[in-house]
């Protein structure tokens, strides 16, 4: 089968070796999928360190993976960045996988942003990363768009932005529209209207409030706030629950 062939080709390189999985902070399922891939597709033994925002997953992982824990091929741990650093640099660990931002990747591999002063990476083990990006949402300029289609796609985009308080790796971040598209203004107006109507969750992710503030400061009058601003009480509650940028 296709799965069998994947197991043959993948496990020969990594099979039986230890991989550290640094869990995602924005979605529960990502860490689970990463562990399953490394265990059953790549043939690795896995140590997963959960993101500080999602340490609640630890107890569930202990139950779900109990048979593999008893076999000695899986472990679930919690801790801060220091714990993560000790794990990835441990001599028994052969590879690393993480879901996070480029700053986290560079901190692990280079000890910070790569520069001419530090041409050699601190971590030379194989590492795979799923990093966030500025995901574009591209509109094809076609005169045949109907009002119904404009509304449908504007709401699709608005819901993608609102989902998970926009704290997803692939959340659309940039809308690309042809400057001469005759429906451009109508689409943007419909999108703004949809965003005003969708209830927004509290942006819980560490540091997101500061990023929003910097964005607004950078663009000045060109930045438009749509919907209600986060109340001071809600912002303080999010900061208390999840702390500053981790």
Task: Enumerate the language-model features and the residues they cover.
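Alpha-helical segments flanking ligand/cofactor-binding loops in enzyme cores
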Residues: 37, 85-86
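Conserved residues at the C-terminal ends of beta-strands
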Residues: 22, 80, 99, 178
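Flexible, charged surface loops at secondary-structure boundaries
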Residues: 12-14, 88-91
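Short glycine-rich anion-binding loops that position phosphate/pyrophosphate groups of nucleotides
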Residues: 25-26, 100-103, 133
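Short acidic loop-to-helix transition motifs that present clustered carboxylates
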Residues: 28, 78-83, 103
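ALDH superfamily catalytic-core signature
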Residues: 45, 65-69, 73, 83, ...
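Conserved small-residue-rich beta-alpha loop and adjacent elements
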Residues: 1-68, 72, 135
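Conserved phosphate-coordination/catalytic loops
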Residues: 56, 78, 148-152
């Amino acid at each position: 089968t296709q799965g069998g062939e994947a197991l043959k080709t993948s496990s020969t390189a990594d099979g039986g070796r230890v991989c550290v999985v640094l869990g995602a902070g924005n979605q529960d399922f990502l860490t689970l999928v990463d562990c399953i891939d490394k265990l059953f597709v790549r043939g690795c033994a896995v140590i997963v360190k959960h993101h500080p925002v999602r340490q609640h997953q630890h107890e569930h992982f202990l139950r779900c993976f109990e048979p593999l824990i008893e076999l000695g091929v899986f472990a679930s741990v919690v801790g801060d960045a220091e714990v993560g650093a000790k794990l990835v640099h441990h001599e028994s660990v052969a590879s690393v996988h993480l879901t996070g931002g480029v700053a986290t990747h560079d901190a692990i591999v280079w000890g910070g942003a790569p520069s001419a002063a530090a041409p050699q990476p601190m971590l030379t083990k194989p590492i795979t990363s799923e990093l966030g990006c500025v995901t574009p949402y591209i509109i094809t300029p076609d005169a045949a768009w109907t009002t119904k289609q404009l509304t449908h796609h504007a709401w699709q985009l608005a819901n993608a932005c609102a989902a998970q308080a926009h704290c997803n790796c692939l959340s659309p971040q940039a809308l690309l529209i042809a400057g001469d598209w005759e429906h451009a203004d109508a689409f943007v107006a419909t999108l703004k209207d949809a965003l005003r109507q969708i209830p927004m969750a509290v942006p819980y992710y560490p540091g997101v409030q500061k990023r929003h503030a910097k964005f607004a400061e950078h663009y000045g009058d060109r930045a438009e706030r749509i919907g209600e601003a986060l109340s001071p009480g809600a912002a303080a509650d999010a900061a208390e629950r999840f702390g500053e940028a981790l």
